Design a protein with these regions (language model features):
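Glycine-rich oxoanion-binding loops at beta->alpha junctions
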Residues: 1-50, 57-59, 85, 96-103, ...
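Accessory alpha-helical/coil subdomains and C-terminal extensions
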Residues: 41, 52-54, 60-75, 79, ...
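Flexible loop/turn segments at secondary-structure boundaries
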Residues: 1-2, 34, 59-60, 88, ...
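Short, ordered loop/turn segments at secondary-structure junctions
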Residues: 1, 30-31, 55-56, 81-87, ...
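Short beta-strand elements at the ligand-binding edges of bilobed clamshell
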Residues: 90-102, 243-246
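Short, high-confidence coil segments that cap the C-terminus of an alpha-helix
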Residues: 47, 177-178, 268
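C-terminal non-catalytic interaction/assembly regions of soluble proteins
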Residues: 197-324
């Protein structure tokens, strides 16, 4: 947003090796920007095609810009390109960056497992990105069979009582003497006090599920005289700032090509995406209706539960229900 409003143009014709590095040479921004000011700047600069690269918030911004362009009857194409590690863009099965983030997340999980196994009743706790969608946590769990509990925003859980996380963790320690827990950052928010404050983009500020788990695990185990050692790993931005995997590089290249083809063919107000191995054009209004979330009745989530062996913890929806 800021680079368009200023405007600040960047010559990229000589940047032939940018695909080898993480990050972005274009920069990024957070917070609402005025669609009117952006379109004013596009007009002044004689820009006829705008590519908006990003996640759910960026696609909503693209929709606002597209509507402002249409209201002025301007000939400016607005094309969205999905890029978010959270994989939470509606109708986009997999966004660019997701595979890379999952790959890096597995390294953190492997470290947590190593630490947990290195001491009696060792517990490795890993917090991964995923404010409202638990795709990274679920996919990384499936990739690493060492995970014993996975917690995601879409599946509430209880701490104590029958089927609670803490009794299940106690049983795990009694039988195997170590455990690994993976939690998406948005998991367990129903157990935390939240102020209701928001960030610059209007997202609710989350409580820290890792702090909750660390304190509650210590309280529960100490009360029962169970010696334990908990090691906490938060890879945070590491999983999104690394160079892309080979598959993500290829995927990104195709997304860029199809986005340019769409714009040159006169398309606008759309997002380019890949569905069932076909690159398609999706209306911006469609992909911004809601945020894509992990379906807890899906094969993916059921496989994650089977991989961990945790089953449905108390508070999660019953497994026997069907998704209508």
């Amino acid at each position: 947003g800021y680079g368009v409003q200023s405007p600040a143009f960047c010559r990229v014709c000589g940047e032939r090796d940018i695909h080898r590095f993480g990050g972005t040479i274009l920069g990024s921004s957070r917070g609402p920007q005025s669609a009117e000011e952006i379109v004013d700047s596009l007009e002044r600069s004689n820009v006829s095609i705008l590519f908006v690269i990003g996640g759910d918030g960026s696609m909503k911004a693209a929709l606002s810009i597209s509507r402002e362009v249409q209201a002025r009857n301007l000939k400016i194409a607005v094309i969205g390109i999905p890029k978010t590690i959270d994989n939470d863009i509606n109708f986009i099965p997999q966004s660019f960056g997701f595979e890379t983030a999952v790959y890096k997340a597995t390294e953190a999980i492997e470290c947590a497992h190593t630490e947990a196994r290195g001491m009696p009743n060792g517990i490795g706790l890993v917090k991964l990105m995923g404010r409202e969608s638990g795709f990274i946590a679920a996919q990384a769990t499936l990739a690493m069979k060492e995970v014993n509990f996975v917690l995601v925003p879409e599946a509430p859980f209880t701490l104590e009582g029958e089927g609670g996380l803490l009794p299940a963790l106690e049983e795990r320690l009694k039988s195997r003497h170590h455990a690994v827990i993976v939690a998406a950052e948005g998991a367990g928010q129903h157990l935390l006090d939240r102020s209701g404050a928001t960030d610059a983009s209007g997202n609710l500020l989350l409580g820290d599920v890792a702090d909750l788990l660390r304190s509650e695990i210590k309280r529960y185990m100490d009360a029962r005289g169970i010696p334990h050692a908990l090691k906490y790993i938060d890879p945070s931005y590491i999983i999104r700032s690394v160079p892309a995997t080979a598959n993500d590089k290829v995927y990104c290249g195709f997304l860029g090509q199809y986005a340019v083809h769409a714009a040159m063919a006169g398309r606008t107000d759309m997002v380019v995406g890949k569905i069932q191995d076909r690159y398609v054009h999706l209306p911006l209004e469609l992909v911004t209706r809601r945020r894509r979330k992990l379906n807890i009745y899906s094969d993916l989530w059921r496989a994650a539960l089977e991989s961990t062996g945790q089953g449905m913890l108390a508070g999660m929806l019953p497994q026997q229900e069907t998704h209508g």
